[in-house]
Regions:
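Charged catalytic cores and adjacent phosphate/nucleic-acid-binding surfaces used
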Residues: 3, 7, 15, 24-124
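Active-site and NAD+-binding cores of ADP-ribose-processing enzymes
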Residues: 10
C-alpha cells in the first residue's frame, strides 16, 4: 500500500521523492501518480536527456515531471540515474554544506534544494 510505505518512510525520518514519474517502459505497466503520498518529485533524470543515454531517452518525461511538481507545490529533485561511467548530468545543489542525510531531507522539504541538469539549467 502506497500510503503505508509513505508513512513508514516518514516514521524512519526519510522523505519520498517520486522517481521518473512519467517514464513509460514495458516494465512499467501504467503511470501512477500519488501527489498526496510523496514529498518531492524527481523532475530531472539525466537518462531522459543525455546524449549518452541508450534507454529511457525522452525529454518529455522530465518536462511532465517538472510541471507536475509545480502543479502540486512539490520540491523538484534530480539525479543522474547513472548506470555507466558515460552518464552524468543531473544533480542537486545546496547553498550550504549538508551535515547528514536527515539534513538533506530537511533541506529538500524547506525548498533549499536546486535541481540541475548539465550544469546550467536549474529548477527549484
Amino acid at each position: 500500500d502506497v500510503k503505508e510505505q509513505y508513512e513508514l518512510v516518514h516514521a524512519g525520518g526519510g522523505i519520498v521523492s517520486h522517481a521518473h514519474p512519467f517514464r513509460e517502459e514495458d516494465y512499467i505497466p501504467e503511470i501512477r501518480l500519488f501527489p498526496d503520498c510523496v514529498d518531492a518529485v524527481e523532475g530531472i533524470n539525466a537518462t531522459h536527456e543525455s546524449p549518452a543515454s541508450t534507454s529511457h531517452k525522452n525529454i518529455l518525461y522530465n518536462e511532465k515531471a517538472i510541471a507536475y511538481a509545480k502543479e502540486h507545490g512539490l520540491p523538484i529533485t534530480a539525479g543522474s540515474d547513472q548506470h555507466t561511467t558515460r552518464m552524468i548530468g543531473g544533480g542537486m545543489l545546496f547553498d550550504r554544506k549538508l551535515s547528514d542525510e536527515k539534513d538533506f531531507c530537511r533541506a529538500v522539504l524547506a525548498g533549499e534544494a536546486k535541481a540541475y541538469w548539465n550544469g546550467s539549467e536549474f529548477y527549484g
